[in-house]
Amino acid sequence: MSHPIQFVNANNSDKSHQLGGQYSIPQDLRENLQKEAARIGENEKDVLQEKMETRTVQNREDSYHKRRFDMKFEPDSDTQTVTSSENTQDAVVPRKRKSRWDVKGYEPPDESSTAVKENSDSALVNVEGIHDLMFFKPSDHKYFADVISKKPIDELNKDEKKERTLSMLLLKIKNGNTASRRTSMRILTDKAVTFGPEMIFNRLLPILLDRSLEDQERHLMIKTIDRVLYQLGDLTKPYVHKILVVAAPLLIDEDPMVRSTGQEIITNLSTVAGLKTILTVMRPDIENEDEYVRNVTSRAAAVVAKALGVNQLLPFINAACHSRKSWKARHTGIKIVQQIGILLGIGVLNHLTGLMSCIKDCLMDDHVPVRIVTAHTLSTLAENSYPYGIEVFNVVLEPLWKGIRSHRGKVLSSFLKAVGSMIPLMDPEYAGYYTTEAMRIIRREFDSPDDEMKKTILLVLQKCSAVESITPKFLREEIAPEFFQKFWVRRVALDRPLNKVVTYTTVTLAKKLGCSYTIDKLLTPLRDEAEPFRTMAVHAVTRTVNLLGTADLDERLETRLIDALLIAFQEQTNSDSIIFKGFGAVTVSLDIRMKPFLAPIVSTILNHLKHKTPLVRQHAADLCAILIPVIKNCHEFEMLNKLNIILYESLGEVYPEVLGSIINAMYCITSVMDLDKLQPPINQILPTLTPILRNKHRKVEVNTIKFVGLIGKLAPTYAPPKEWMRICFELLELLKSTNKEIRRSANATFGFIAEAIGPHDVLVALLNNLKVQERQLRVCTAVAIGIVAKVCGPYNVLPVIMNEYTTPETNVQNGVLKAMSFMFEYIGNMSKDYIYFITPLLEDALTDRDLVHRQTASNVITHLALNCSGTGHEDAFIHLMNLLIPNIFETSPHAIMRILEGLEALSQALGPGLFMNYIWAGLFHPAKNVRKAFWRVYNNMYVMYQDAMVPFYPVTPDNNEEYIEELDLVL
């Protein structure tokens, strides 16, 4: 808890007793500090308030992105009023000095301030007309004051009533529950023209610039703008600038979903308002003094170009890029071209010539920022044009090359990057020449201290190393030694972005240098004292070995590599998993060549399994699991048994992360060993695992269930049936887990256990679970019953669960139907043998008063009909059709979805002709709701059987033709 700062002389005591000189900070500064300290003391926030603050968009953005809150609309009376009131609130009020006569005794307040606040908030949320609100924030007072005002609606004029209605709709969209939000959004969309653009945008746009807005609220407000734009059409033209002020900053948001939403709004706006209006609005911002405004304007213009066509914008871009009035306009024009290249991707090829004519002259511009952004734009266009378009870039190669030889610093970096991006587009002979020349510059700039230059060198090096004329010999003699000397240093390891680029470049160079040479150069970093440097080296070794293998490593280099990796593993103190994953990648690649090194590695693992630090024990167990297949390939079965015994003795581990890794290692050993020779034996391991199933840690649960399932699959006879039943009851508890992977593993394990000890005992435990109230547990139990039926045969399960259906309890009957649904989905066309067997049960379910019964029975019919189509059971399906078709008038969304699925499946089993006989009469029924239900089914049939339905359309009798009634009969 922070406390207010206590200042010397803050209590205004008598100064006549001060012996020293009265030298201090200025009075106004001291008063400001005192006010700030008092504010901190009064407004201390608890943890929940701090978390709520971090959810706001403003608090998650950096200083650059926060600048969008400073953007202003065109000045009008409303904004001036708000600004003046804000300035009044923020003005420094002179502090009034108190005398001792002003001090009064304590007087109890008439009302509790907390109670007053709570009552006022609840009154706001429950006020008439806005009862569906979920919350009402303090910042909402500013934008929705007319909604919560006490003024009677009869005293309002027509426009004020309309404004209050609009505010209420916006408030429900922003703060309301889901149903209220959808209704309000639909009403606002339908009445957008009635409200008019002025009223809507003056209310809506300021909310989007509110600093306390959260992601969800911002998303809803932006969605509202998007919907309204379609309705208003041309009426939005006067408000294009205001909308862009809100929408353009979304294009630089960190969240890709927000960026795509911003693009969608600007696309719709440009379509509605037209090119002329958009460009007229953007024109002043092209040469704005603020770099932030120019940046978002360039991105918005690129979106407009994508929406309306790049060719439409080319004259405007060309004029901006060749502007003589302002270099900032040229800078923004070039940036528009860059953003077009990013947005269109390979589609920029069609417009490459026109865009190049706009920017080619800017490489020789007098202003450095213009030259830099031009080079970056050329680089972007070249990367997005790969592997085509070098003919267009020929015009800029000469000025680029001259610039590389004459420039230094950031300009050189950008020019070098542009040439490096064009090299992959060139023919091999030209690419070889430019690469050789570029390599001289790269070698010279290896010593550059500038991080931007370093990244550019690395990117160009990646592209140049792929050129055919650059030989492995040239790289080894001229580039690689200096590259490893300059870039493989500790300082680079601490810079994460540069670290990643260096690692990737090393792997790219390794394709030509070879695995042996690269590994040899990385051995020194692997043994370094600095852990980040070792971790960086392991990353590079892992990716190199995965890419190239270890076939060209000699015996000496293998020994040194394993030794270095073992040192890195032993010295590890952080939680990065790459160390043992890298170790695993090398061992898997070496395979049987690892045999001489297994003894010291396993010895290290055993020592680490007894280490006092949990993280060390966890890494040892993880490495052990990775090494198991290699140890097995080396036929070191005694070593596996020794490891298994040590791991078994460690099952009393108290740290769940470590215990999960130990169980996973034991699982790996059991999966590769001969179970007759496994030590300790399965009948000793399984009873130890059963109580561990109660551990609620996710990693422990997943690995334990997986291990038990493996034992049930490979060695069911090694444990007595009673032990398996104990495990069944433990697994039933795991079906309640919130983790999907755990529930899926538990269900699969039920199948293995049922196969091991027979379905009857397992079914007893599962059927008891159908009687519980918890829906998720009943659903998982139904899935488990379906799996048992698939493993042990439906003939073992169906009689039992059909008998269970006679229980007069809704939950049990629903569970049985759901189990049948999963079962028939799993067993496929085996279902055909049981159609007549379960028809009476489905008949009962489809005529039940409970909607969920009918819904689940429809699901059963869906799987039956799809799996048994064409098997000659049409009579049973017609019977089920007669029972299902009356349900098409249901209004519940979940139920009608399942019922329609069932009808579509029956149409597959019966054919469109027979099925459509049930539909024709309903299509022209006098009641609208009846027609609506049947037309919905007909539309689905029309999509599925458009051509097959033609012979079955009703034939009207014609006096001129002979009409044969028998052809309409279904035999």
From Swiss-Prot:
Record Gene3D superfamilies: Leucine-rich Repeat Variant
Entry keyword annotation includes Cytoplasm: no
Recorded GO CC terms: catalytic step 2 spliceosome; nucleus; Prp19 complex; spliceosomal complex; U2 snRNP; U2-type prespliceosome; U2-type spliceosomal complex
Listed Basic and acidic residues bias regions: 54-75
Keyword entries, A-Z: mRNA processing, mRNA splicing, Nucleus, Repeat, Spliceosome
PANTHER family xrefs: SPLICING FACTOR 3B, SUBUNIT 1-RELATED
SUBUNIT field: Belongs to the CWC complex (or CEF1-associated complex), a spliceosome sub-complex reminiscent of a late-stage spliceosome composed of the U2, U5 and U6 snRNAs and at least BUD13, BUD31, BRR2, CDC40, CEF1, CLF1, CUS1, CWC2, CWC15, CWC21, CWC22, CWC23, CWC24, CWC25, CWC27, ECM2, HSH155, IST3, ISY1, LEA1, MSL1, NTC20, PRP8, PRP9, PRP11, PRP19, PRP21, PRP22, PRP45, PRP46, SLU7, SMB1, SMD1, SMD2, SMD3, SMX2, SMX3, SNT309, SNU114, SPP2, SYF1, SYF2, RSE1 and YJU2. Interacts with RDS3.
Note: Present with 521 molecules/cell in log phase SD medium.
Similarity section: Belongs to the SF3B1 family.
Protein name: U2 snRNP component HSH155
Gene source species: Saccharomyces cerevisiae (strain ATCC 204508 / S288c) (Baker's yeast)
